């Protein structure tokens, strides 16, 4: 659909408007790409397209905070470019995506960002923004982070505690990056797994002859995720930087996050559709291609209670957002690791299915209501990205990114009918309640009743502002009230000890009665020939008369009777 949004008038009539905090019956009038009115018996100009939403929900368009379109990773390029990926998003009810820029080590962040913009701008069908990965650390990287925030509309950076020798940062580097994020008001996204132990676990599995996809689950147990999660929360707390954990996959990591929030630490967290709905039993499937299709990191967990638990954490706000982490590869690409599971490209599809699957397992499953569904799929992301209430809410003045959602309609997911790329679907044959009937992006109907009507390049890049209130407002206040200060005291005016050995470890001047001896001449090893101990010559007890022997009548412990 090439028509300019300024010339389109739309009236959504008879529906129930759902925001993250309330639901009410209202009509919605859209013009010039903006929601102009919300209410009953609206006075609107003529010529508007009327969409009957009777019995339907009118919700904010979804915001998918983690997608990887046109990205090369582990020697394979994701099968979806920005056109096909954003098209699939719109068909599924998502109207904004956040992509990833992943620079190689020792390369420019700004150059990688500009390259990604060059790939995306001519292709996108919906609004988008970009995270930038921090894969190495140097003063130049810090300067480029400032440039990206100040001039390029970036407000989030992603770090990895895994992918050793590729993207992994050491703790000291994480500390510096988090300090930099806090100073410029950016969101620090962290993939938390203990990369050192993951690498050792992979070696051990391969040594045992385990080469199949199950090696992913075996080498990355949930305790490695929990440990890294606790560690990075600690580092973030020391730097007073808000932390955003991504791809949370386990009960253990969820418990660490819940405990940190209870302690008042500023922690946000995101899980994925796959982790919140599937299990790692698929890695043990007899069909190698089936098992490999589910390879993602952290891996899906064997404990069948995990997905239900993560959905509960989404419902109670321990986890704030659910993303697709969409990065599909074909079976042929996955087969690059047929002899070695460490070479299977990590990634699964899901940008098209995210909304319906979460509705089915979350709302229909009784874990959350329609308002919480809007929060985890749209509103919370908008708040974190500093876009709320321009996006993520149905109110006058907001962007006209709107979905007419039918909670009663059903669909059966299948790779044969999907718009997103790849030759496999994780949710094959899943029957979902909750279907987007109409998707409106930037005030234009782009999808209606199964028909897609949008040309590539009609989406726009959304610059993101730094210091989002949802995380930084409380931290700024904390720094004012809890600022560390030194003690005001009278200066010390007494004597100061002189350093005995300049250039070596400082130590006080020895007292006069402190026994000393010359420094050894043999590299720290004691030379017995230099010992001051002697068995000859004058001794302090020479004046005491010596006896050949002495009989002890009452030895310690009392007398004893002789046996012999």
UniProtKB/Swiss-Prot annotation:
Keyword terms of this UniProt record: Cytoplasm, Disease variant, Methylation, Phosphoprotein
Cellular compartments annotated: Cytoplasm
Entries under InterPro entries matching the protein: Amidohydro-rel, Hydantoinase/dihydroPyrase, Metal-dep_hydrolase_composite, Metal_Hydrolase, Metallo-dep_Hydrolases_sf
A GO biological process held by the record: nervous system development
GO cellular component terms, A-Z: cytosol; dendrite; glutamatergic synapse; neuronal cell body; protein-containing complex
Sites bearing Phosphothreonine, chain numbering: 509, 514
Top-rank taxon: Eukaryota
Entry-annotated residues carrying Omega-N-methylarginine: 559
Listed Pfam families: Amidohydro_1
Main location: cytoplasm
Effect upon mutating residue 47 to R: In RTSC4; reduced inhibition of dendrite development in transfected primary neurons; decreased interaction with MAP2; decreased interaction with TUBB3
Entry keyword Cytoplasm: yes
Entries under CDD domains matching the protein: D-HYD
Keyword Phosphoprotein in record: yes
Residue(s) carrying Phosphoserine: 532, 538
SUPFAM superfamilies, per the entry: Composite domain of metallo-dependent hydrolases, Metallo-dependent hydrolases
Gene Ontology terms, MF aspect: hydrolase activity, acting on carbon-nitrogen (but not peptide) bonds, in cyclic amides
Family: Belongs to the metallo-dependent hydrolases superfamily. Hydantoinase/dihydropyrimidinase family.
Subunit record text: Homotetramer, and heterotetramer with other DPYS-like proteins. Interacts with DPYSL2, DPYSL3 and DPYSL4. Interacts with MAP2 and TUBB3.
Physiological role: Involved in the negative regulation of dendrite outgrowth.
Disorder cited: Ritscher-Schinzel syndrome 4: An autosomal dominant form of Ritscher-Schinzel syndrome, a developmental malformation syndrome characterized by cerebellar brain anomalies associated with global developmental delay and impaired intellectual development, congenital heart defects, and craniofacial abnormalities.
Record protein name field: Dihydropyrimidinase-related protein 5
Classification of source organism: Eukaryota, Metazoa, Chordata, Craniata, Vertebrata
């Amino acid at each position: 659909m090439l028509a300019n949004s300024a010339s389109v008038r739309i009236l959504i009539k008879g529906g129930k408007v759902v925001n993250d905090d309330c639901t009410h019956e209202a009509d919605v009038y859209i013009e010039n790409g903006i929601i102009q009115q919300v209410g009953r018996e609206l006075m609107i100009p003529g010529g508007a397209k009327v969409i009957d939403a009777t019995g339907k929900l009118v919700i904010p368009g979804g915001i998918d905070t983690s997608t990887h379109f046109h990205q090369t990773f582990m020697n394979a390029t994701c099968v979806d470019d920005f056109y096909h990926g954003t098209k699939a998003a719109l068909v599924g009810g998502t109207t904004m995506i956040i992509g990833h820029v992943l620079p190689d080590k020792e390369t420019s962040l700004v150059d990688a960002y500009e390259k990604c913009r060059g790939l995306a701008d001519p292709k996108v069908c919906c609004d988008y923004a970009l995270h930038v990965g921090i894969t190495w650390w140097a003063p130049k990287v810090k300067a480029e982070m400032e440039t990206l925030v100040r001039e390029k509309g970036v407000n989030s950076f992603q770090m990895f505690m895994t992918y050793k020798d590729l993207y992994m940062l050491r703790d000291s580097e994480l500390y510096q990056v988090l300090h930099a994020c806090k100073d410029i008001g950016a969101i620090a996204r962290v993939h938390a797994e203990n990369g050192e132990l993951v690498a050792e676990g992979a070696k051990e599995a391969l040594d045992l002859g385990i080469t199949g996809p199950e090696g992913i689950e075996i080498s990355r147990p949930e305790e490695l995720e929990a440990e890294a999660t606790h560690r990075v929360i600690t580092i973030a707390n020391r730097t007073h930087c808000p932390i955003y954990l991504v791809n949370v996959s386990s009960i253990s990591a969820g418990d660490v996050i819940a405990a940190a929030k209870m302690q008042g630490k500023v922690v946000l967290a995101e899980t994925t559709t796959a982790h919140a709905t599937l299990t790692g039993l698929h890695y043990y499937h007899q069909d190698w291609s089936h098992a490999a299709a589910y390879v993602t990191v952290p891996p899906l967990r064997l404990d069948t209670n995990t997905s239900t638990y993560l959905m509960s954490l989404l419902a109670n706000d321990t986890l704030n957002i659910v993303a697709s982490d969409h990065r599909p590869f074909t079976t042929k690409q996955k087969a690059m690791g047929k002899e070695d599971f460490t070479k299977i490209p990590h990634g699964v599809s899901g940008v098209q299915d995210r909304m319906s699957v979460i509705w089915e397992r979350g709302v229909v499953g009784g874990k959350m209501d329609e308002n919480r569904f809007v929060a985890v799929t749209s509103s919370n992301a908008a708040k974190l990205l500093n876009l709320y209430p321009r996006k993520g809410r149905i109110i006058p003045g907001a962007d006209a990114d709107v979905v007419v959602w039918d909670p009663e309609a059903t669909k059966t997911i299948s790779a044969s009918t999907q718009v997103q790329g790849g030759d496999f679907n994780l949710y094959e044959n899943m029957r979902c309640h909750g279907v987007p009937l109409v998707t409106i992006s930037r005030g234009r109907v782009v999808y209606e009743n199964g028909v897609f009507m949008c040309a590539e390049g009609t989406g726009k890049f959304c610059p993101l502002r730094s210091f989002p209130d949802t995380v930084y407002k409380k931290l700024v206040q904390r720094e004012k009230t809890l600022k560390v200060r030194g003690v005001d005291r009278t200066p010390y005016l007494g004597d100061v000890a002189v350093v005995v050995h300049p250039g070596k470890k400082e130590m006080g001047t020895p007292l006069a009665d402190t026994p000393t001896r010359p420094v050894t001449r043999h590299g720290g090893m004691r030379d017995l020939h230099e010992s001051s101990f002697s068995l000859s010559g004058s001794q302090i007890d020479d004046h005491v008369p010596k006896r050949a022997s002495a009989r002890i009548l009452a030895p310690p412990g009392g007398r004893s009777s002789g046996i012999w």
